[in-house]
Amino acid sequence: MRLPAQLLGLLMLWVPGSSGDVVMTQSPLSLPVTLGQPASISCRSSQSLVYSDGNTYLNWFQQRPGQSPRRLIYKVSNRDSGVPDRFSGSGSGTDFTLKISRVEAEDVGVYYCMQGTHWP
């Protein structure tokens, strides 16, 4: 009979909006681009993303139309295997940027920043 109460307690830990939540804000929300030209997206965190081990766990994901998201960049500036070098990540603390040096047609999609430093 204690199990439901325990489950409720666990679920309450994951309620968004509780104190300590990290808010990630991207801009711009929409970006018209020209093929062959550069593009950049900014991401700001409400708290520093520097973890106690000294690493900054900020990831960038790309979701092409009709596909699942794939990670492009991890720990701010490290490209995942197979990601073209026209993609680069930079930043520190609370402010981060994803840059595409020369936009290609296959780059159309939705881009997300995600932090992995603070968990509920």
UniProtKB/Swiss-Prot annotation:
Residues 75-81 are annotated as: Complementarity-determining-2. Residues 82-113 are annotated as: Framework-3. Residues 60-74 are annotated as: Framework-2. InterPro entries: Ig-like_dom (IPR007110), Ig-like_dom_sf (IPR036179), Ig-like_fold (IPR013783), Ig_V-set (IPR013106), IgV_Light_Chain (IPR050150). Residues 1-20 form the signal peptide. Transmembrane segments: none annotated. GO terms for biological process: adaptive immune response; immune response. It is found in: Secreted; Cell membrane. GO terms for molecular function: antigen binding. Residues 114-120 are annotated as: Complementarity-determining-3. Residues 44-59 are annotated as: Complementarity-determining-1. Residues 21-120 form the Ig-like domain. PROSITE patterns: IG_LIKE (PS50835). Gene3D superfamilies: Immunoglobulins (2.60.40.10). Disulfide bonds join C43-C113. Residues 21-43 are annotated as: Framework-1. It holds the Pfam family V-set. One of its GO terms (cellular component) is extracellular exosome. Keywords: Adaptive immunity, Cell membrane, Disulfide bond, Immunity, Immunoglobulin, Immunoglobulin domain, Membrane, Secreted, Signal. V region of the variable domain of immunoglobulin light chains that participates in the antigen recognition. Immunoglobulins, also known as antibodies, are membrane-bound or secreted glycoproteins produced by B lymphocytes. In the recognition phase of humoral immunity, the membrane-bound immunoglobulins serve as receptors which, upon binding of a specific antigen, trigger the clonal expansion and differentiation of B lymphocytes into immunoglobulins-secreting plasma cells. Immunoglobulins are composed of two identical heavy chains and two identical light chains; disulfide-linked. This is Immunoglobulin kappa variable 2-30. It comes from Homo sapiens (Human).
